[in-house]
Amino acid sequence: MIYYGTMFDHKVRFSIVRMREVVEEARNRHSLSYLATVVLGRALIGAALVTPWLAEKERWTLDIEGNGPIRRVVAQSTSEFTVRGYVANPKVELPLNEKGKFDVAGAIGQGVLRVVRDLGLKTPFVSQLPLVSGEIAEDLAYYFAVSEQIPSAFSIGVLVDSGGVKIAGGFAVQIIDRTLEQEKVELIERNIKNLPYITELFQKAEPLDVLERIFGEKVGFVETAEIRYKCDCNREKAKNALLVLDKKELEDMRKEGKGEVVCKWCNTKYVFSEEELEELLKFKVDNSGS
């Protein structure tokens, strides 16, 4: 569940989310290792936190590429409060870092963060920045500060063990009106700095309690929505993906008796029979003029 709203005469906006089930679904769909679960989980939470601020029908993509062993993590969210994502190396594992935590920064390494905002226009808006930490929360705050000139704080965490995902969630606070009194800015900064790790916080406190600790007072009107893992892949799109292949690749599949397309976002497998591949080959030939 995501909670979102504004504070201090709408000069500050916030979102806070708990989404253990969503991250657990991602872990199961992609058969993720512990570390890969934490990396993708953090990215999905980051993408979920911005959903209340998206335009209608907007698709927002966080794409992190680094020289670490996980290589790439991608998370996408929509204005309908859905998320989906994947990592390039779902089996990655590393020793715990010096703080005894999962080494997310080590898994990602040095690299770049891209944010793609697709508003349904001809060309999506793309921003690219160097990673500042590889921990994802700090990188998101840096992106908003530099690319969108919005001072932001993000805190994101995932706790996983042999039984699966135990806790997954985070919060984002953004100053959207620079006329906010300096004492309020300092209050928010101080309160956030004094908070424990989000995974520890969510073991003891509910989201509204966390917001009260951040702002130093009870929040007023809060909206809520359910975050869902949802992919828009289907058999027709999988068929179109096969049509992109050259004729020889399709013929090789047909000779093997079947063809498979696996969705990178949700790991759904679409299997096409020999007869279906024959039809695709015929369609390809008929439409190529050869």
From Swiss-Prot:
Protein origin, superkingdom: Bacteria
Pfam families: HSP33
GO CC aspect terms: cytoplasm
Chief location bin: cytoplasm
InterPro entries: Heat_shock_Hsp33 (IPR000397), Heat_shock_Hsp33_C (IPR016154), Heat_shock_Hsp33_N (IPR016153)
Keyword Disulfide bond attached: yes
Any one GO molecular function term: unfolded protein binding
GO biological process annotation, one example: protein refolding
Cysteine pairs bridged by disulfides in the record: 231-233, 263-266
Posttranslational mods: Under oxidizing conditions two disulfide bonds are formed involving the reactive cysteines. Under reducing conditions zinc is bound to the reactive cysteines and the protein is inactive.
Record keyword Chaperone present: yes
Key words of the record: Chaperone, Cytoplasm, Disulfide bond, Redox-active center, Zinc
Cited function: Redox regulated molecular chaperone. Protects both thermally unfolding and oxidatively damaged proteins from irreversible aggregation. Plays an important role in the bacterial defense system toward oxidative stress.
Family statement: Belongs to the HSP33 family.
Descriptive protein name: 33 kDa chaperonin
